[in-house]
UniProtKB/Swiss-Prot annotation:
The chain crosses the membrane at residues 4-24, 33-53. It is found in: Cell membrane. Pfam families: DUF1328. Keywords: Cell membrane, Membrane, Transmembrane, Transmembrane helix. The lineage of its organism: Bacteria, Pseudomonadati, Pseudomonadota, Alphaproteobacteria, Hyphomicrobiales. Belongs to the UPF0391 family. This is UPF0391 membrane protein RL4195. One of its GO terms (cellular component) is plasma membrane. It comes from Rhizobium johnstonii (strain DSM 114642 / LMG 32736 / 3841) (Rhizobium leguminosarum bv. viciae). It is a multi-pass membrane protein.
Amino acid sequence: MLKWALIFFVISIIAGFFGFSGVSAATATIARVLFGIALVIFLIFLVLALMAGQAIL
């Protein structure tokens, strides 16, 4: 349990560093792009799964 507390403490320190520095604006843009890509891939796989499910029936 202490191990997880230390891991999350380190993550929070790193997140705080990025939040209070100028890096956060650049990383927010990258995060938005990656989220958009992940959303598109999810929708593609969702459509493919629905089409495969209908092909079985």
